[in-house]
Each structure stands twice: as C-alpha cells, then as structure tokens.
C-alpha cells in the first residue's frame, strides 16, 4: 500500500521474481546496455533498471552504458559512453540489454562478452541472444516491461528509477497518445506514486528546440496539396 492506495502485484512477466531473487544475487556488478542511436525508451529501460537495482541492491555495483543525449530533466543521470567502461568489469558482470531486437543493434557490442546476458525487449523476437530473455511484443515499450518486472517483486522502487522509466514510456507512446492498453496508464500511475515527476518528464521530451522548429518549418514549406493528397518533396 502506497499513499493509501493498494496496488496489485503484477505477475504478467513470468520468472521475473526468480530473476531478482536468484540471478541478480549471483553477481557483484551489473551493466545495462541498449541499442544504437538510443531513444527515450532505450534510456528509460536501461537507466531506470540500473537506478532501481542500485537502490534495491546497494551492495552491488551498477553501471549504464549508452550515448543517449536527448532532452531530459537536469537531475537525470547520464549513462557512461560506449567503450569507456572497462572490459574487465563487463566480462565479470551480469549484462542486461534492453529495447534491442537483434545483436547487430547493440550499441556497445562488448555487452555480449558479459558473464551472463539477459535480454529485455518488446520487439518481435527474430534474433534470440543471451542466457535469459524477457520479451513481450504486445507491450508498448520496453520501459513498461521493466516496470512490470520491478513491480512484480517490489511494491516501492527508488524515485529516480521511476522517473527514468516514466521517460521511456512517455517517449515510446508519444506522451501516452499511442498507449496500447489500460495497463500503460496503470503503470504510469504507479511510477508517479513512487516519486516520478510527470510534468517535468513530459515537458522535457515534448519541448521543441530551435533546430526542431526549423526542421518542421522546412517540411511544411515543402508540403504540396493535390486534391485529397498531401505530400512532401525534398531535393
């Protein structure tokens, strides 16, 4: 029960409880990775899980590797750049790869050199890799799967983890406009009750930079209308 609201235990991700109780416990260090040209869901799922594990298992060393550099609230933690984390750490760690459908799309391929590899994803499972997979292509984002897994075992997660996961969900669902099911809203509610700041997070990913405005202007200026057809031509 959080803030006088009773939340149901989520068991929609099979074996996730065993993952936290056994797999995590076997390692002293954990490294999170995601895909090339990382978007908000790549950041939210990897950094969100890293921060959650860091708070829930304070005796373990947790790292997040990625080049995500899109707008986000100032207090959000930035990942370690690909190639900067010692290969010795990676080889002796549990490596978790999120939001990445194929091996070829892993941003830092050294992730596959980890001692034990876990894949968490919501894309069609065309390329199976790793020692353990949590894949549900019916989910709107990988960050929702991470939230599912965490809430199946922990009623409360760190606020900074909740905020990062929220960013991932909002990013992949265009601010919940593309949410696939009521569960997306339910998970967002739980994240907010765990300390995520909806307004700051939504504002950070929905604000347009001058570069974005200039690009939109160029697209609109190149738009043609013929009858009921609207199209854009770029030279």
Label each PLM-derived region with a short phrase.
Residues 7, 12-79, 86-93, 171-235:
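Hydrophobic helix-and-loop "lid/oligomerization" segment in the mid-to-C-terminal part
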Residues 3-4:
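Intrinsic-disorder-associated, low-complexity terminal segments enriched in Asp/Asn/His/Tyr and depleted
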Residues 77-132:
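Active-site cofactor/cluster-binding pocket
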Residues 58-60, 115, 155:
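Short glycine/serine/threonine/alanine-rich loop segments
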Residues 49-50, 112-115, 135-136, 187:
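Glycine-rich, phosphate-binding/catalytic loops in enzymes
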Residues 37-38, 102-103, 151:
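Short beta-turn/strand-loop junction motif enriched in small, turn-promoting residues
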Residues 122-188:
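Short alpha-helices
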């Amino acid at each position: 029960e959080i803030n006088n609201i009773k939340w149901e235990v989520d068991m929609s991700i099979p074996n996730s409880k065993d993952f936290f109780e056994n797999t995590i416990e076997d390692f002293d260090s954990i490294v999170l990775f995601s895909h090339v040209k990382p978007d908000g869901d790549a950041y939210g799922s990897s950094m969100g899980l890293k921060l959650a594990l860091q708070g829930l298992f304070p005796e373990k060393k947790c790292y997040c590797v990625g080049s995500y550099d899109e707008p986000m609230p100032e207090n959000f933690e930035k990942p370690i750049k690909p190639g900067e984390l010692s290969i010795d750490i990676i080889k002796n760690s549990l490596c978790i790869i999120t939001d990445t459908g194929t091996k070829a799309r892993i941003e830092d391929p050294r992730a596959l050199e980890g001692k034990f590899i876990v894949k968490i994803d919501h894309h069609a499972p065309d390329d199976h890799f790793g020692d353990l997979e949590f894949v549900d292509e019916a989910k709107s984002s990988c960050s929702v799967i991470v939230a599912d897994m965490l809430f199946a075992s922990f009623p409360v997660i760190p606020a900074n983890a909740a905020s990062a996961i929220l960013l991932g969900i909002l990013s992949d669902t265009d601010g919940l406009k593309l949410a696939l099911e009521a569960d997306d809203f339910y998970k967002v509610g739980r994240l907010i009750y765990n300390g995520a700041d909806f307004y700051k997070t939504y504002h950070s990913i929905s604000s347009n930079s001058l570069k974005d405005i200039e690009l939109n202007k160029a697209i609109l200026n190149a738009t043609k209308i013929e009858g009921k057809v609207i199209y854009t031509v770029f030279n």
